[in-house]
């Protein structure tokens, strides 16, 4: 193909992507303008918690809600002491200034995530981010999911460049939502990336120890009570994870554990058979939303890498690509938060498990060797 034709094709692709991004942004801006839950509800809980970090009252609900009520509706705090203490870097500012800095940091984190994730098509990632209602919800509510994505992307970028210790340290930044990172140790162990796993464990141990320094020896008990309060997860049936599926059955805790075993094994097999680190990381992040005990609609921003990899790879069948494109629309989010959560759960959980299983079956039939650890 002549160079001029290549240039024309490239320009058309960029224009189409720009149009798609503009349409997605317009849709999400309209959603934000009609938001009924209030802006920065989650940021408000982080702001209040950071003011109490180090006082021994971080999980004292009366103290927390008194501070939260100054700015927005009250939400129960669920962050570890070291996370709440670190948020003082922003939350020591006046509330409006802290809001602006938090939003700016979130936007930068999302941009770096899209640029840094190994192997991700940047144009498709930009379109996916602009169309993603979970990303928009996270920004509107002031969630810390963007910082989780930043830590994950930085970790896998360093891992792809042969810097496993730096990668492990970066993974520890996912401590803000540690339950969603449960797929990462499975990936690192499956691919025998022991240096990165050891570094992540060491960094995590340091952060855990720092939590005792911040909040005293009794914080684990107070934290356990806080996260098991009925008001902490009032919308558990609307989550798209194993906990939500087990919610309707007898002995839901035992059912969730039993369901987690084959899902963890599927992720292990997927990571063993996938030589592309970016794709394996995408599967681990997506599986974390299924295995994690707690996760709302905004947390499904973690699916974006797997959705983009599914769309960008020519060998993926059209029916699986179409499923991924459907998940990039507002449909699953609206189903989860609306009156049809079970349909949303089937769409989200079904896609993640199907994508991992398809990859395992293809790699098994092709006889691909396991990836070489960095």
Where are these regions (language model features)?
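Membrane-embedded alpha-helical segments of transport systems
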Residues: 176-179, 205-210, 324
């Amino acid at each position: 193909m002549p160079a001029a034709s290549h240039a024309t094709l490239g320009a058309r692709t960029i224009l189409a992507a720009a149009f798609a991004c503009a349409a997605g942004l317009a849709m999400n801006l309209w959603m934000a303008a009609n938001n009924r839950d209030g802006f920065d509800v989650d940021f408000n809980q982080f702001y209040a918690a950071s003011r109490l970090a180090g006082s021994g009252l971080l999980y004292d609900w009366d103290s927390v809600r008194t501070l939260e009520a100054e700015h927005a509706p009250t939400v129960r705090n669920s962050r570890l002491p070291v996370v709440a203490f670190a948020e003082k870097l922003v939350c020591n500012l006046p509330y409006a200034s802290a809001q602006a800095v938090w939003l700016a940091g979130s936007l930068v984190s999302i941009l770096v995530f899209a640029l840094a994730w190994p192997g991700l098509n940047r144009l498709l990632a930009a379109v996916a981010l602009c169309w993603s209602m979970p990303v928009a919800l996270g920004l509107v509510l002031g969630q810390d999911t963007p910082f989780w994505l930043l830590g994950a992307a930085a970790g896998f970028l360093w891992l792809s460049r042969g810097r496993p210790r730096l990668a492990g340290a970066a993974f520890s930044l996912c401590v803000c939502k540690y339950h969603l990172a449960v797929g990462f140790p499975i990936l690192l162990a499956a691919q025998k990336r022991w240096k990165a796993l050891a570094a992540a464990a060491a960094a995590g141990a340091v952060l855990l120890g720092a939590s005792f320094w911040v909040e005293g020896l009794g914080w684990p008990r107070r934290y356990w009570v806080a996260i098991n309060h009925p008001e902490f997860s009032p919308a558990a049936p609307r989550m798209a994870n194993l906990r939500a599926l087990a919610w309707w059955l007898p002995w839901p805790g035992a059912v969730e554990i039993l369901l987690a075993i084959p899902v963890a094994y599927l992720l292990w097999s997927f990571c063993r058979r996938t030589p592309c680190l970016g794709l394996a990381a995408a599967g681990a992040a997506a599986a974390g939303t299924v295995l994690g005990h707690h996760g709302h609609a905004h947390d499904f921003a973690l699916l974006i890498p797997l959705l983009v990899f599914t769309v960008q790879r020519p060998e993926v069948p059209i029916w699986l690509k179409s499923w991924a494109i459907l998940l990039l629309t507002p449909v699953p989010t609206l189903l989860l938060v609306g009156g049809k959560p079970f349909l949303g759960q089937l769409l989200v959980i079904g896609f993640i498990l199907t994508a991992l299983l398809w990859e395992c079956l293809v790699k098994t039939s092709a006889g691909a060797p396991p990836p070489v650890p960095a």
